[in-house]
Curated annotation (Swiss-Prot):
Protein name: Probable protein kinase UbiB
Keywords: ATP-binding, Cell inner membrane, Cell membrane, Kinase, Membrane, Nucleotide-binding, Transferase, Transmembrane, Transmembrane helix, Ubiquinone biosynthesis
Function: Is probably a protein kinase regulator of UbiI activity which is involved in aerobic coenzyme Q (ubiquinone) biosynthesis.
Database matches in InterPro entries: ABC1_dom, Kinase-like_dom_sf, UbiB, UbiB_bact, UbiB_kinase
NCBIfam families given in the database record: PRK04750.1 (NF003404), UbiB (TIGR01982)
Encoding gene per record: ubiB
Amino acid sequence: MTPAEIKRLYQIIKVQLEYGLDELLPDHQLTKAPLLMRKSLFWIKNKHPEKPLGERLRLALQELGPVWIKFGQMMSTRRDLFPPHIADPLALLQDQVAPFDGQLAKEQMELALGGPLQNWFTEFDIKPLASASIAQVHTARLKDTNQEVVLKVIRPDIRPVIDSDLKLMHRMASIVAGAMPEARRLKPVEVVREYEKTLLDELDLRREAANAIQLRRNFEGSEELYVPEVFPDFSNETVMVSERIYGIQVSDIEGLEANGTNMKLLAERGVSVFFTQVFRDSFFHADMHPGNVFVKPEHPENPMWIGLDCGIVGTLNSEDKRYLAENFLAFFNRDYRRVAELHVDSGWVPADTNVDEFEFAIRIVCEPIFAKPLCEISFGHVLLNLFNTARRFNMEVQPQLVLLQKTLLYVEGLGRQLYPQLDLWETAKPFLEEWMMNQVGPQALVNAIKDRAPFWAEKLPELPELLYDSLRQGKAMNQRMDQLYQGYRHSKRQQATGKFLFGVGATLVVCSAILVDNAYEQLSIASGIAGVTFWLLSWRAYRR
């Protein structure tokens, strides 16, 4: 380790001890030395003993800085690995840090765009509109159209910090996984690797721009969701320019009510937007926390969601979508056998899983949920219960389902915050049933033909030639089959002849032995020679 890494490691340990996070260390032979060092070398006491462990963990991560804040946010979504008293406080982590110098931000933008900002923008505000751990946002106007825009720029000093902390995270995860077998259940190495991929993706604003363009295209003309326009000509790896929007933050209940917003419709549209993204588009915004969701102030009787920050998205293939929809329908019909079979059929759990035991485990965990009215049942917790149960049956981590679960919890939480009586199942069931009908009914056949139409249009001119080749190959194959059949029949005849000759030869040899005993020497010799001759003929017949 370099001196800088050692210094950073000491800072991390110091903060952890100040918040008493050594309590997270299990009672293990290997943890005795660190606990002894805590008392003998560091002399650092827990400064917040009155706070719950989960809250202390949140405060410690917040103090350690942006990389650890985002790591905590990701941990809060992995409820299959972390218990509620840890995951719930981590969900409150706020990704807000002090802004860096606006002049430095301007220089970074000009370096990325290849010229002075006044070449393309006017009214650039040196004061940031918002600041987060990865990037900072400033406002301006497009010079050609006078349209208001926001310029998002990656922090210039963030990459070395991220690389350094990620190295430490990987080292610590490897040590924990190697030294404590019982800790491997939490999969520390895989968790850090997943986090690294997510974090590095957020450092490339081209990815976010592409995601926003795709999401905007998917909901073009929709009354439910609006995604601000991105200007790709001014966007690259470290800078992204998009349309500036004005809206009411979705968590501002008082502001929404003061504006006369139809809260019931707004909540139901949130559910509709989620299921449309998942089942129609197979492409969903996976970071829909309240800071990224606004509501248009115009037409409050017909409210529209606004989605920002498309850095994290999820995708599902057609098999995942079908199994997910069938799982929901089977669960709410209390068909636990079907739920178990679907997990096996989808490959989410091993093929040799005992379906009877799996069904029983699902029933024990999920049946108490139905003691509540349907309007009080949480979709997100349904998924959580299913995945946690499946984990006991060696279900592999499905990253796309983890993102889906996190997003569903966000959407469900926002929906019930807006309209506490929201019946998520009543809103979602018609959508799921219609989607399933489209997958297995006549419409599914029509859709499949439409999807394959370009392929067949391309192959149509080649069809006569392909048909001729198929007929020619079929004729050649028939001839070959005839030859093989004739050879087979000839072989069977030869085998029958060989068996007959062998039997005659054996009979003559036996007769030869009998004749010797009865003093018919010459006849015995002749019979023996004839028997051997028939054996040779039978061997020759087999050879053919």
